[in-house]
UniProtKB/Swiss-Prot annotation:
Catalyzes the ATP-dependent phosphorylation of thiamine to thiamine phosphate. Is involved in thiamine salvage. This is Thiamine kinase. Pathway: Cofactor biosynthesis; thiamine diphosphate biosynthesis; thiamine phosphate from thiamine: step 1/1. InterPro entries: Aminoglycoside_PTrfase, Kinase-like_dom_sf, Thiamine_kinase. It comes from the Bacteria. It comes from Salmonella agona (strain SL483). It catalyses: thiamine + ATP = thiamine phosphate + ADP + H(+). Keywords: ATP-binding, Kinase, Nucleotide-binding, Transferase.
Length: 274
């Protein structure tokens, strides 16, 4: 279902106009991006997502809806409704753990995603990193950040190993263990890109866990494991800068202390690695 109304509505207006029998249940806690709530009617639940990023164009939110509309139920919740500023998606019943699944299970899930038809829009990190720099708190801009940004822009993004649809925010809170298997939620950063970029961006605990995931994926995708790992390492500086910039971006938008703590920790990691 899609509305033709071009003016963003409040949550209460959305409920009264399109979901009159539903009431807010609990806020969605998965992920860091916010902007979600769960609405319920008797035992039936729906996730209502708001376009929460004032600096992102409406087209980005529409892409999120299109990605969910295109993906199979074996990967993601179904898109149920869209109107400018809001969408409703299927609520997935299951267990959410902060820890990632084991390497084989996660590799199978990501490989299944990467076998799907492409979304139709490319993920471009260079302009995104530049946006984070320009939109962050000016007091947080450092010569170190600018040097790293310019070096990445000079080098250019790695040539893709394989192009596929990517999720780009894979961590434990965005994976639901349903009765039918693992599913991914929170697809707002989805787009087409290198499979090694996806693997580089997974929120792993350490390099050992990262290598296990890469090896499991290589075996499933029939890719040389050493070649895949080299490609992942090429993307690594981009991913670390992406995370640091995103934390800074969200800090400027929200003022929430969790983001500044995460940004500081990510900058420390970058400085330690030179």
């Amino acid at each position: 279902m899609r509305s033709n109304n071009n003016n963003p509505l409040t949550r209460d207006e959305i409920l009264s106009r399109y979901f009159p029998q539903y009431r807010p249940a609990v806020a969605a806690s998965q992920g860091l991006s916010g902007g979600s709530c769960i609405i319920a009617h008797d035992t039936h639940r729906i996730v209502l997502r708001r376009h929460h990023d004032p600096d992102a164009p409406p087209a980005h939110f529409l892409r999120h809806h299109r990605a969910l509309s295109q993906l199979p139920a074996s990967l993601a919740p179904r898109a149920l409704f869209y109107t400018p500023g809001w969408m409703a998606v299927e609520y997935l019943h299951g267990v959410v753990n902060s820890a990632l699944p084991d390497a084989d299970e996660l590799a199978a899930l990501l490989y299944h995603l990467h076998q799907q038809p492409r979304f139709g829009w490319r993920i471009a990190l260079s302009p995104l990193l530049a946006q984070y720099w320009s939109c962050c708190d000016p007091a947080r801009r450092t010569p170190f950040w600018l040097r790293r940004l310019k070096q990445l822009q000079k080098n250019g993004e790695p040539r893709p190993l394989r192009l596929a649809p990517l999720h780009m925010d894979v961590h434990g809170d965005n994976i639901v263990l349903t009765s039918a298997g693992l599913r991914l939620i929170d697809w707002e950063y989805a787009g087409d890109g290198d499979i090694a970029l996806e693997l580089a961006a997974v929120w792993v605990e350490d390099e050992r866990q990262h290598r296990q995931l890469a090896d499991a994926y290589a075996a499933r995708a029939r890719i040389d494991a050493r070649q895949l790992w080299r490609q992942i390492r090429l993307w690594h500086p981009w991913v670390i800068m992406l995370k640091a910039g995103w934390f800074e971006y969200r800090w400027r938008q929200t003022g929430e202390q969790q983001f500044i703590r995460l940004a500081d920790e990510t900058w420390r990691q970058l400085r330690m690695k030179g």
